[in-house]
Curated annotation (Swiss-Prot), chains A, B:
Protein name: Protein Msed_2121
Xref: SUPFAM superfamilies: Molybdenum cofactor biosynthesis proteins
NCBIfam families in the cross-refs: PRK01215.1
Family annotation (InterPro entries): CinA, CinA_Arc, MoaB/Mog-like_dom_sf, MoaB/Mog_dom
């Protein structure tokens, strides 16, 4: 059974190109290493109807997990909790545990719980808050028809804190799958020359091989070759990746290429 | 009339988190500065059916432009042209102009046009190739029911070359809109304290204001305040952004905050 995942990142700054979406790649990498297959990453604006409708679309594809990032803060344009509630046809309610966390973070410093601060404890009905150790706004999770939805703040270190806490303690189903990859660099072989050989090895072994061009195809051919596989037995997965790597290296040598610095030998 | 845009980035490396999607932010920034409103950025795997189905979804939302990046190369997993053709119910055909470009790039160097190399000239029926000045695989464009689709390679400098060539010479409809933003940094005011004031100014002026937290809400409040607006008259747009900036700065001073280094005065 495939454990699929989707990532939804919310924030106008992603759509104007102001912010590079490093949250998406952090989350994708973390989920991949846990054995999830990330199928789609979507970035949308801070808009209520848009958030609600994309949440519905994603749930229609029934992933095992959806990680949502951004829009949990105190400002007028933070509307992820409300958007998720709307997408699920649930009410937005004051969550007592989240409220306790906010009280602790503001009131113990003598700061009043204004309307903007209280807003961060308004979660979709049935959601469980996830403590934010690196900032204020709590994350939250809820399971809908077998899909774990987890919402994290957009500030990177807060996203990481909430995501790790979720993955380590609250994940409903953990994939029984191990993912492994290795890469190496090749000089002097064009991507289009290596292509038919790689196609043959992929077809025969089922291992994923991708060439990432780094130089210029004809004038200065320089490629990174990535080999990735996943399976239940970590030792077996590593062994398969390494044996395929040796086969590709042998082909590169036959084609007159040279192996550059190996990144993860 | 709103000129909406979508971006579709294709490549397994984006979904495993191996590659940070800097192409998406480059394209988003370029389109935003031209006056487009980027509504959605999607990243998916190199999978034929997935590409075809996402292309259909995007066209169903009728954006003015869709920029697709990645998957135009010579390898077995480069299948963007075929996926777009399938999504449009068009045939994939050998394009004579693209073939001429490949002949020039390979045969003039004494390199044969193998099957893998010829594949890069197979484009959806009716597509116009866009010369790739920075690499081999040509980009292409086609207009479907008023939506400009433009496909670029995934290697960043090749994407930039093809995209610029498209935007400067082949774009069907150019938005008559100018976008402008300024930012400044604030110390000593919590985001939740500034929030109600900003909400009021946004409501009154229609100007977009976003606070980006950079420090820690209660222990070391530090915010970047971004002010953005767009309209037909560049001078008027700048004037509005600057006057709103002064209003927000005045509020910050009243709240006891200090203005840090101004980024674009």
């Amino acid at each position: 059974m495939l454990y699929t995942a989707e990532i939804l990142t919310i924030g106008n700054e992603l759509l104007t190109g102001r912010t590079v979406n490093t949250n998406a790649s952090y989350i994708a990498s973390r989920l991949t290493l846990m054995g999830f297959s990330v199928r789609r990453i979507t970035a949308i604006r801070d808009e209520l109807e848009e958030i609600a409708s994309v949440i519905k679309e994603i749930l229609g594809r029934s992933p095992a997990i959806v990680v949502v990032s951004g829009g949990l803060g105190p400002t007028y344009d933070d509307m992820t909790a409300e958007g998720i509630a709307k997408g699920l046809d649930r009410k937005l309610v004051m969550n007592e545990d989240a409220l306790r966390e906010l009280r602790e973070k503001y009131q113990t410093r003598g700061l009043p719980l204004t309307q903007e601060r209280l807003k961060m404890a308004l979660l979709p009905e049935g959601a469980k808050p996830i403590r934010n150790e690196a900032g204020i706004a709590p994350g939250f999770t809820l399971n809908v028809n077998g899909t774990d939805i987890v919402a994290t703040p957009g500030v990177p270190r807060e996203m990481e804190s909430v995501l790790e806490s979720f993955l380590n303690h609250m994940l409903t189903r953990r994939p029984p799958v191990y993912y492994y990859e290795e890469s190496f660099l090749v000089r002097g072989v064009m991507e289009s020359t290596l292509a038919p050989h790689i196609k043959g090895i992929v077809k025969e072994t089922g291992v994923y091989i991708k060439t990432h061009p780094k130089g210029h195809e004809t004038s200065e051919p320089y490629l990174e070759v990535q080999i990735a596989y996943s399976g239940e037995n970590p030792d077996r997965v590593k062994e398969i990746v390494r044996s395929v790597k040796e086969r590709v290296k042998a082909v590169v040598r036959e084609l007159g290429g040279t192996l550059d610095r190996v990144q993860n030998p």
